[in-house]
């Protein structure tokens, strides 16, 4: 991994700190570990300290998870199909949904942007962190590893 830019280091540190309470798995100096506060201290004090979290790509969202995300964002209607379209490093997640509205009217495509400015977003960001989803684009930047499918147990 070597030296990373200050911007990437800050992005990684922000992500790791937000996930600290949830049992995030990481590769630390090539060994799989569960994230703890000692690793955070190393990252702050040593710019060459190598740690990569295992995160789920946004494309791994399940139907039930998308439904829950819609519930958290106070969206009405039953989701019948979905596709995670895109996400960027600023924390915005674009989700394209085909759904049946509360009035029973089918809507072919509903494009929804989950963005930090939404008043319900704190719940959403906590949920995304708790479910180890890579909404910051760390995998694409080489700052995180894609988690194997069953690394994190499904929450009931």
Predicted regions, residues:
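Structural boundary micro-motifs
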Residues: 1-156
């Amino acid at each position: 991994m070597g030296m990373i830019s200050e911007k990437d280091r800050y992005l990684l540190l922000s992500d790791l700190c937000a996930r600290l309470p949830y049992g995030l798995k990481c590769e630390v100096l090539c060994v799989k570990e569960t994230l703890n506060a000692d690793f955070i201290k190393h990252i702050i004090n040593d710019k060459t300290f190598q740690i990569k979290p295992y995160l789920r790509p946004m494309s791994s969202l399940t139907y039930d998870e998308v439904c829950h995300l819609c519930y958290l964002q106070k969206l009405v209607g039953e989701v019948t199909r979905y596709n995670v379209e895109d996400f960027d490093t600023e924390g915005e997640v674009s989700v394209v949904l085909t759904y049946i509205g509360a009035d029973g009217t089918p809507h072919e495509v509903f494009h929804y942007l989950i963005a930090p400015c939404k008043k319900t977003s704190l719940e959403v960001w906590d949920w995304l962190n708790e479910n180890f989803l890579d909404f910051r684009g760390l995998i694409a930047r080489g700052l995180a590893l894609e988690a194997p499918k069953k690394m994190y147990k499904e929450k009931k």
